[in-house]
Curated annotation (Swiss-Prot):
Gene3D superfamilies: N-terminal domain of ligase-like. One of its GO terms (biological process) is sphingoid long-chain base transport. Optimum temperature is 30 degrees Celsius. Activates long-chain fatty acids (LCFA) by esterification of the fatty acids into metabolically active CoA-thioesters for subsequent degradation or incorporation into phospholipids. Also facilitates the transport of LCFAs into the cell, either by active transport or by decreasing the intracellular LCFA concentration. It may supplement intracellular myristoyl-CoA pools from exogenous myristate. Preferentially acts on C12:0-C16:0 fatty acids with myristic and pentadecanic acid (C15:0) having the highest activities. Also involved in long-chain base (LCB) uptake of sphingolipids. This is Long-chain-fatty-acid--CoA ligase 1. CDD domains: LC_FACS_euk1 (cd17639). It comes from Saccharomyces cerevisiae (strain ATCC 204508 / S288c) (Baker's yeast). It is found in: Lipid droplet; Cell membrane. One of its GO terms (molecular function) is long-chain fatty acid-CoA ligase activity. Belongs to the ATP-dependent AMP-binding enzyme family.
Length: 700
């Protein structure tokens, strides 16, 4: 009999739905808080965690000692002529990690909370603190401080953009903003529109003694503050340290003001990949339930000896819940950035991975694909014999594991040691969330580094829907339901998904589910049923063992000319695994039969291919590959390889690309082609290369 990781609870309401299911450990009732806790608010939760782990390290961070700028001249085609263009790269020089214990963090939380009240924020649902900053220890400390005084937090990605930021500030009537010094210039227009803002708290003190980048960092922040005060002379500005100092000085004057379970904890603004960002309302009871549900799936596998590296945006619910989970485990958080993870991207110091030596790491598909391709590039540069030994060991290990032959897990540990050392050498688990990853990428990284678990959730469900339990490890599934949710699948007739086939739109209910979108009745009524089911817009499928598998999103299913649907995210996860692809956006014109791939190329392997085809000279640098992205011979070769990738991974017919176009440049939150959660902004990407896409369709 097949083991069942979820169980039905009651019968299907009608023939158009599956029976609702829960994690088998929560058959009787779903969790509303983490096991072995008594908390009902985020403040009570962290107090329990901090008191239990007192003297252990809670979090670590690195200071930026200097930012080094390096320039290189590269040849680039401009108006058809080869021209020398200067490109600049920024490299960070960082300190070693500094640490706070859980005891110290308790004091800091209360001091920040008192400091916020001292400057003028009132402990209630009306005065809100806007967190508009990159992930850091100070972001989390501001969040915790606000919780200690019952002050709701509003989160906005540091790359949300001016329009989105203004929308979130005005809609919530936020009274204070915490931000990075580098983001101060971007507040000049928003604070003119958002007249409720009275206080700005910036990450670092602004001092002329700061000589980093020859004083540019200081000067930029100093000038921005002056500009802000010109347009809003009533706004008061403070540094993080100012708030901390005010809190220390008022410890006998201001009491803690704990929130209630039904009070507002935070409003999290979605990244707005389409349309205006929506504010997801999360009460304290929602967040506590979300953390509790997720904790059930990995409770036996993590603990207070683990070291968790964190670099995803804290404005993303996935990262926030994961860091709160780390407190529950008693693990130590190490703050990092995508730019400084590896030693190749820093100067005069080690990268974050080698410096911190994490045991657990969370990322999104784009991060893992970059890791995988970086490893493949290293392998490709090995001597022939070493390369052969590597692939022999890898394929033998893979086959032994697939056939369940004992010893497969340990095979190749010596061969793969160098790769593991580059990630700190101590990783035990990786977790992917936020977007689908190809089965091949999951299997590859699992076998070279450590098991990659898959998580699935949404801001509206407080990130908590599924996490693959390490004891039930399986490739290609979203995994076990968390302990707080009840899930059913509902017919999507127009797309051909029916509950009778164990497929349909994923509907979720539980104490973790948002009660509403902030001041948005229309969106709320569309997403939530009157009896509390949240309609995710994702298409799911129940596996025979009760695992949930996510097939795609309703909005990313496109009907082609012949009446059949293709799943864009599914195709992207497959084609993204190709060695020549750094990122891909699949576009399907509804008047055509097949889609087109818009590709950000992976420079190193593409350069090798161009040299092999005689398109580039052997002495040419990979930087120069940008000059050959419209070469017909190169495009044809990559297109052929992509078709092979698709066929090898089971794609057929209309799922195979009609053609490809190369995109000259990266897709980053800064240039507006992806969100901070690395979700594609499809319309913007298409508009940038529309002529090329039209040309592909015309010739196919």
């Amino acid at each position: 009999m097949v083991a069942q990781y979820t169980v039905p609870v009651g019968k299907a309401a009608n023939e158009h739905e599956t029976a609702p299911r829960r994690n088998y450990q929560c058959r009787e009732k779903p969790l509303v808080r983490p096991p072995n806790t008594k908390c009902s608010t985020v403040y009570e939760f962290v107090l329990e965690c901090f008191q239990k782990n007192k003297n252990s390290n809670a979090m670590g961070w690195r200071d930026v000692k200097e930012i080094h700028e390096e320039s290189k001249s590269v040849m680039k085609k401009v108006d058809g002529k080869e021209t020398s263009v200067e490109k600049k790269w920024m490299y960070y020089e960082l300190s070693h990690y500094h640490y706070n214990s859980f005891d110290q963090l308790t004091d800091i939380m209360h001091e920040i909370g008192r400091g916020l009240v001292k400057i003028g924020l009132k402990p209630n649902d009306d005065d809100k603190l806007h967190l508009y900053a990159a992930t850091s220890h100070k972001w989390m400390k501001m969040f915790l401080g606000a919780q200690s005084q019952g002050i709701p937090v509003v989160t906005a990605y540091d790359t949300l953009g001016e329009k989105g930021l203004i929308h979130s500030l005005v809609q919530t009537g936020s009274k204070a903003i915490f931000t990075d010094n580098s983001l101060l210039p971007s507040l000049i227009k928003p604070v003119q529109a958002a007249q409720d803002v009275k206080y700005i708290i910036h990450f670092d003190s602004i001092s002329s003694e700061d000589r980093r980048q020859s004083g540019k960092i200081y000067q930029s922040a100093h000038d921005a503050i002056n500009r802000i005060k010109e347009v809003r002379p009533d706004i008061k500005t403070f540094s993080f340290d100012d708030i901390l100092k005010l809190g220390k000085e008022s410890c006998n004057e201001i009491d803690v003001h704990p929130p209630g379970k039904d009070d507002l904890c935070c409003i999290m603004y979605t990244s707005g990949s389409t349309g205006e960002p929506k504010g997801v309302v999360l009460k304290h009871s929602n967040v506590v339930a979300g953390v509790g549900g997720a904790s059930l799936n990995v409770l036996k596998f993590v603990g207070n000896t683990d070291r968790v590296i964190c670099f995803l945006p804290l404005a993303h619910i996935f990262e926030l819940v994961f860091e709160l989970l780390s407190f529950y485990w008693g693990a130590c958080i190490g703050y990092a950035t995508v730019k400084t993870l590896t030693s190749s991207s820093v100067r005069n110091c080690q990268g974050d991975l080698q410096e911190f030596k994490p045991t657990i790491m969370v990322g999104v598909a784009a991060v893992w694909e970059t890791v995988r391709k970086g490893i493949l590039n290293q392998i490709d540069n090995l001597p022939f014999l070493t390369k052969k030994i590597f692939w022999t060991a890898y394929n033998t290990k893979l086959n032994m594991q697939r056939l369940h032959i004992p010893g497969g897990g340990a095979l190749g540990n010596l061969v793969f040691k160098k790769i593991r050392t580059a990630t700190g050498g101590q990783l035990r688990y990786l977790l992917n969330g936020g977007s689908p990853i190809s089965r091949d990428a999951q299997e590859f990284i699992t076998n070279l580094i450590c098991p990659m678990l898959i998580g699935y959730g949404l801001t509206e469900t407080c990130a908590s829907t599924t996490i693959l339990d390490p004891a039930n490890f399986e490739l290609g599934v979203a995994g076990d339901l968390t302990g707080c949710v009840t899930v059913k699948l509902v017919d999507v007739e127009e797309l051909g998904y029916f509950a009778k086939n164990n497929q349909g739109e994923v509907w979720i209910t539980g104490a973790n589910v948002t009660p509403e979108y902030y001041k948005n009745e229309e969106e709320t009524s569309q997403a939530l049923t009157s009896d509390g089911w949240f309609k995710t817009g994702d298409i799911g499928e129940w596996e025979a063992n009760g695992h949930l598998k996510i097939i795609d999103r309703k909005k990313n299913l496109v009907k082609t000319m012949n009446g059949e649907y293709i799943a864009l995210e599914k195709l992207e996860s497959v084609y993204r695994s190709n060695e020549y692809v750094a990122n891909i956006c699949v576009y399907a014109d509804q008047s055509k039969t097949k889609p087109v791939g818009i590709i950000v190329p992976n420079h190193a392997p593409l350069t090798k291919l161009a040299k092999k085809l005689g398109i580039m000279e052997q002495k040419d640098s990979s930087i120069n590959i940008e000059n050959y992205l419209e070469d017909a011979k190169l495009i044809k070769a990559v297109y052929s390889d992509l078709l092979k990738t698709g066929k090898d991974q089971g794609l057929v017919g209309i799922e195979l690309l009609a053609g490809i176009v190369f995109f000259d440049g990266e897709w980053t939150p800064q240039n507006g082609f992806v969100t901070s959660a690395q979700k594609l902004k499809r319309k913007d990407i298409l508009n940038a290369v529309k002529d090329k896409v039209d040309a592909v369709y015309s010739s196919s």
